[in-house]
Amino acid sequence: MENLNIDMLYIAAAIMMGLSAIGAAVGIGILGSKFLEGAARQPDLVPLLRTQFFIVMGLVDAIPMITVGLSLYVMFAVV
């Protein structure tokens, strides 16, 4: 029974990492498409849009990194 709980923790950690990576990829894709759409509509605002794009992209990309840390905690410290 103990072995089953450890296996479930590993599966939970894998699901956490996978879903966060998929969510971040979708978010960055949508963010990039909206950036290109905004740059095409108003080319004079490209420097401002680019700055905001990279700030938000960094925040979106931080979510999978935090999830990797949490999943490693679940795998190694919870048991």
Swiss-Prot record:
Q: What does this protein do?
A: F(1)F(0) ATP synthase produces ATP from ADP in the presence of a proton or sodium gradient. F-type ATPases consist of two structural domains, F(1) containing the extramembraneous catalytic core and F(0) containing the membrane proton channel, linked together by a central stalk and a peripheral stalk. During catalysis, ATP synthesis in the catalytic domain of F(1) is coupled via a rotary mechanism of the central stalk subunits to proton translocation.
Instruction: Determine if 4Fe-4S is one of this entry's keywords.
Output: no
Membrane-protein topology: Multi-pass membrane protein
Localisation: Cell inner membrane
GO molecular-function terms, A-Z: lipid binding; proton-transporting ATP synthase activity, rotational mechanism
Q: Which InterPro entries match?
A: ATP_synth_csu_bac/chlpt, ATP_synth_F0_csu, ATP_synth_F0_csu_DDCD_BS, ATP_synth_F0_csu_sf, ATPase_proteolipid_c-like_dom, F/V-ATP_Csub_sf
Using the UniProt record, give the first listed, main subcellular location: membrane
> Pfam families from the entry?
ATP-synt_C
Which family does this protein fall into?
Belongs to the ATPase C chain family.
* Keyword Cell membrane part of the UniProt annotation: yes
Which gene specifies this protein's sequence?
Answer: atpE
Q: Where are the transmembrane segments?
A: 11-31, 53-73
Residues flagged as site, Reversibly protonated during proton transport: D61
Q: What is this protein called in UniProt?
A: ATP synthase subunit c
Q: How does it assemble?
A: F-type ATPases have 2 components, F(1) - the catalytic core - and F(0) - the membrane proton channel. F(1) has five subunits: alpha(3), beta(3), gamma(1), delta(1), epsilon(1). F(0) has three main subunits: a(1), b(2) and c(10-14). The alpha and beta chains form an alternating ring which encloses part of the gamma chain. F(1) is attached to F(0) by a central stalk formed by the gamma and epsilon chains, while a peripheral stalk is formed by the delta and b chains.
Q: Could you list this entry's UniProt keywords, alphabetically sorted.
A: ATP synthesis, Cell inner membrane, Cell membrane, CF(0), Hydrogen ion transport, Ion transport, Lipid-binding, Membrane, Transmembrane, Transmembrane helix, Transport
Q: Which GO terms describe its cellular component?
A: plasma membrane; proton-transporting ATP synthase complex; proton-transporting two-sector ATPase complex, proton-transporting domain
- Tell me the PROSITE patterns matching this sequence: ATPASE_C
